[in-house]
Amino acid sequence: MTERVLVTGSSRGLGRAMALRLARDGFDIGLHCRSRRDEAEAVAAEIRAVGRTAWILQFDISERESARTVLEADVEANGAWYGVVCNAGVSRDGAFPALTGEDWDGVVHTNLDGFYNVLNPLVMPMIRRRRPGRIVTLASVSGLMGNRGQVNYSAAKAGIIGATKALALELATRRITVNCVAPGLIETDMTEDLPMEEMLSMIPARRAGRPEEVAAAVSFLMAEDAGYITRQVISVNGGLC
C-alpha cells in the first residue's frame, strides 16, 4: 500500500520541491494551498507525471476551524496520514520598534498556531493506525540564532522548534518520529530582492542553498530507515550555525 504524505504550503518554493521529491520517493502527496490553487494544480500534474497520486487541500493554516474541517474530512475519506510536512508560513520583516501589532500577530499566529491547527486534528488518527509515522516541521536559522529585523519570525520559529521537541517526546513510543528542518538562505522567489552579496559573506559555504537540498533532508527524515531519529533539528544552512 502506498503511504500518504501531506505537505503544507506546497504550491511553490520549498513546499513544491519537497512535494516533488517525496513523490519521487514513492509517496502519494496531499498538496496544501491557501489561495494559489492554480499553482498547486500545476504541482499536482508534475506529481502525476511521475506515477503518483496527488490531490489538493485548500485552507488557511491560521484559521483553526476551517483547517480542522478540511483535514478531518480528508482523514474520514482516505484514512490517516503516514507523514506530515509542516512547511506553510509567513514573514513580515522590520526593525522591532517599527513592528505593528498586526506584524507580530500575523507572523506568530500563522507560523506557530499553524503547528497546532494542522497537527492536532491529524496526530490521533496517526496514533490509531498503529503503524510508524513521520512528522517534519520547518523552522529556520532565525529560530536557532535570531536575526535582525525578524524578531517576530525568530520567535515563531523558535517556538516551532520547542513544540517539535515536545511532541517528539509524546509520540516516541508510538513509532511516530517528529523532527525539524531549519533552512538558512535558500534560493526562492522570496530571496530575489535581498542583498545577496552581503548575506553570502556571512555563510561559510559562500552560496545560497537550493530548495532541492532542503527537500533532500525532509526526504531522509520521512524514510522508513529514519525510524530511530526523532526530536532532532537538522540545519540546512551552509555552515552558518
Description of each model-found segment:
Residues 172, 177, 229-231:
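Short, small/polar-rich loop/turn modules that mediate ligand/substrate recognition or access, typified
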Residues 11-12:
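Conserved glycine-rich cofactor-binding loop
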Residues 95-96, 100-108, 199:
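Substrate-binding pocket helix/loop in short-chain dehydrogenase/reductase
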Residues 145, 197, 201-202, 219, ...:
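Short C-terminal tail/terminal secondary-structure segment
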Residues 140:
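Residue(s) in the substrate-gating loop at a strand-loop-helix junction
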Residues 27-41:
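Conserved glycine-rich Rossmann-like NAD(P)H-binding loop of the short-chain dehydrogenase/reductase
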